[in-house]
Amino acid sequence: MIIIEKTEQIKGTINAPPSKSYTHRAVICASLADGTSEIISPLNSADCLSSVHGAMMLGAEIDATDKNKWVVVGNNNSPKTPNNVVDIGNSGTTLRILTGIASQIPEGYAILTGDSSIITRPMQPLLDALNQLGIRAFSSKTDGTAPIIVEHGEIKNNVVKIRGDMSSQFITSLMMTMPFSKMDSTIELTTPLKSAPYLDITIDVLDKFGVKIEKVKNKNKLTKFIIKGNQKYKPYSYTVEGDCSSASYFIAAGVLMNSDITINNIFKNSKQGDREIVNIVKKMGAPIIEEEDKIIIKGPYKLKGIDIDVKDTPDLVPTIAILGCFAEGTTTIYNGEHVRLKECDRLMACAKELTKMGAKITEKPDGLIIEGVGKLNGAEMETYHDHRLVMAFTVAGMMAEGKTIIKGEDAVKISFPNFVEAIKSIGANITIK
């Protein structure tokens, strides 16, 4: 467990960890290429290593012993039939992307599963989409969750329709699978898209590895994606940028506390949706300094509550919830039904756990209404095996009066293995027992 005492001041320079989203996509694209790629500055986390393991099961050769550079020999656009069940641990991204890719094995079946949390995550929308393409993919339990069984087979149809307001990972999986088709093909969105920046990341990484995706808009709304057939993944030397989601906890701590911190490896031109945290804290009243590749914060700042649409930034919800507790007035988080489909129901978890600390939060179907109380009290916090809750609640504990105990700190291995060391390095009053 993590034990946190109120922290009076934070000071220093930290480097944002490499992006989890970019690392996943880059290593899987490299694993399909017709040559040798390098992934430079990858995120060496449990989730991303699940993608390494899964890609190797499908025929890639990957040397991940150097934590600063992974060397990937691709399977030459020909995934191999795995010789065992593909266990992807706790990585939903890996499960969803490789479910599509696994359909391109030459014979037999691929079975994909994971830990006790992963086998509860919804998969049916992706399975239905793959079935539309003529691919046989189904839940072994017939309930739309892993274990997932995928049969080898060519893509027979060239149009797939899928909701845009569920998980963008389903669409990412289709984008990375459909270039194997002999035909030009189309992904049509049947509902407005949420988490669009994650698809921009997918398209950006695919482009670097030689695969092109065209976006089509109707009345300024994204409605479909067009994917040319017979495309081939090409090798590439890919450098992973910093993770804005992980940086958000340091940004929150910086604006709330007496601080003088610099966060490196966060780029102004990033396609990551979670870079929106910079705009959010500015709108709330924190004039933080942005440079080309870093953020400088000299807090504390007096924040005011605002309304925040989290359609494209679901991973920021726990961070925003903490900020709202200390802002003057009301902070409303809305358009976040999909936040309930993450590692846990994050809307429920934030409302329930922060209330223990004295927060005034009303849970809504699509978000949270947070009345700024200006003060929290230490409490014992459950984190539901969710890495983002561990990190957000740590910031809450640093601001709270008294002692805060956070359970399940091992979850940070998913996205930010050295989180505790990093936040201690700038002055957080934390011990681990």
Swiss-Prot record:
Pathway given in the UniProt record: Metabolic intermediate biosynthesis; chorismate biosynthesis
PROSITE patterns, alphabetized: EPSP_SYNTHASE_1, EPSP_SYNTHASE_2
Protein name: 3-phosphoshikimate 1-carboxyvinyltransferase
Protein location: Cytoplasm
Catalysed conversion reaction: 3-phosphoshikimate + phosphoenolpyruvate = 5-O-(1-carboxyvinyl)-3-phosphoshikimate + phosphate
One GO cellular component term: cytoplasm
Binding residues annotated for phosphoenolpyruvate, in chain numbering: K20, G92, R121, Q169, R346, R388
Annotated source species: Methanococcus aeolicus (strain ATCC BAA-1280 / DSM 17508 / OCM 812 / Nankai-3)
Its EC number(s): 2.5.1.19
